[in-house]
Amino acid sequence: QWRHVMEQGLPNAGKVHVARNAAAVYDLLSGREVPFEKRDGRIIVPVNFSTNDGRIFLVADRRIASLAVECPRSIKRGSGFPFRVSLRDSDGKTLRMPVPLKIKLATATGRNLFEDYAATDEKGELEKKINIPLNLDAGTATFSIKELASGGKISVIVSLE
C-alpha cells in the first residue's frame, strides 16, 4: 500500500461497543434503525465500511414509533406559521431526547417556502415559527417533517389565505 492513493478506501468491518442499555440504535446518516446485541449491560453494534465512509449512531432508551405535529391548518399570508413537533414511542409518550429533523413547507405548485434542518430539544420537542411571504397566491401548501433517525415522516396540508 506504500505510495498508493486509496481514493475508494478499503473494506473494513468491526463492532462498536457502548457501555449502556438501549431499546434502539439508529444510523443518522442512513436514516434507519440498525441491529445490535445486548451483552453485560452494554450494546454491540456491528459496522461495515465499504469505503472511507463513517457512521453517526443515536442510542435510544425507547424506540421511535411516530411523529406528532401541532400547527394551524390555515396560514394568513404575511404572518407567522407556528408549529410544534414531538417524537412519540409506541405508548404515545414523548421521547425526551434530541433527534434531527428536516422541515419543509412547499406550495401546491412545488415552490419551496421554507426548508431547514433542526432538532428536538432534551424534552423531545421543537417549537418554531416560519415567516410566510405576503406576496403568495392563495391556495394550499404541504408542511412536512422527516425525522432523520428512523426516517419517519408526517405531512399536513394547510391553506394559504
What are these language model-derived features?
Residues 27, 103-107, 145:
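Conserved aromatic beta-strand anchor motif in extracellular beta-sandwich/beta-rich domains
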Residues 131-137:
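Short, surface-exposed loop/turn segments at beta-strand-coil junctions that are enriched for proline
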